């Protein structure tokens, strides 16, 4: 996949199985742009992105709409609707509510269902956002620095929850982080990026 950005030209190629892949590198190395291209929020200039047997993007011929990609995306700022309760944030647009109910119990936020985002803590917002991302039953989960705003205790809890959810649902996850320690704790593989290029693809022992 290639995409020309303001200061760099992004040029990367990698595959993901049912594992946690970490995109690691300095600011401006193209990490978030990669997630946005996979999610359909940005278009690569050339290249191919495929999820299982479904082609999401292929050069100029194919560009699958966001809503058809079956991808969950957790943004750095969580992007919760401030005027909606926790339950409405999670269940918005869903036909079946049973899975969302199950997830809320799994992540320990069922007691927050009638509260609004401004009434809950940063860790609770993070768990609400990740519940919303998984509630759509995605085939791939994208996480853009989801733990950066949390304190040390909340971050440690969120790490354990993510690993538990991955073991439970076994879907591929691509995680962006600036923390080497976080990358090594959570990742099965770390992709080191610099100036839009993949420098190293390193398994975590």
Enumerate the predicted regions with their spans.
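Conserved ABC ATPase "signature" region
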Residues: 54-58, 97-113, 163-164
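ABC ATPase NBD coupling module
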Residues: 56-73
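Conserved ABC ATPase signature
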Residues: 116-120, 124-126
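A short, proline-enriched helix->beta-strand linker immediately N-terminal to the Walker B motif
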Residues: 135-139
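Catalytic Walker B motif of ABC-type/P-loop ATPase nucleotide-binding domains
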Residues: 141-145
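Helical segment within the ABC ATPase nucleotide-binding domain
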Residues: 156-169
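Conserved H-loop
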Residues: 170-176
């Amino acid at each position: 996949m290639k995409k020309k950005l303001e200061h760099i030209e992004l040029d990367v190629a990698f595959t993901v199985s049912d594992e946690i892949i970490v995109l690691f590198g300095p600011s401006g190395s193209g990490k978030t742009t990669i997630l946005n291209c996979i999610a359909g929020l940005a278009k690569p200039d050339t290249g191919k992105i495929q999820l299982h047997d479904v082609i999401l993007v292929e050069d100029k011929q194919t560009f699958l709409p966001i809503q058809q990609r079956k991808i969950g995306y957790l943004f750095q700022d969580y992007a919760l609707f401030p005027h909606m309760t926790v339950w409405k944030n999670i269940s918005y647009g869903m036909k079946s509510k049973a899975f969302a109910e199950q997830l809320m119990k799994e992540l320990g936020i069922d007691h927050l269902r009638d509260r609004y985002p401004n009434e809950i803590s940063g860790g609770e917002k993070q768990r609400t956002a990740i519940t919303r991302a998984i509630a759509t039953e995605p085939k791939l989960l994208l996480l853009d620095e989801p733990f950066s705003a949390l304190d040390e205790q909340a971050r440690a809890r969120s790490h354990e929850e993510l690993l538990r959810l991955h073991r439970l649902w076994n879907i591929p996850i691509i995680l962006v982080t600036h923390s080497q320690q976080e990358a090594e704790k959570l990742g099965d593989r770390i992709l080191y990026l610099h100036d839009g290029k993949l420098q190293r693809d390193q398994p975590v022992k």
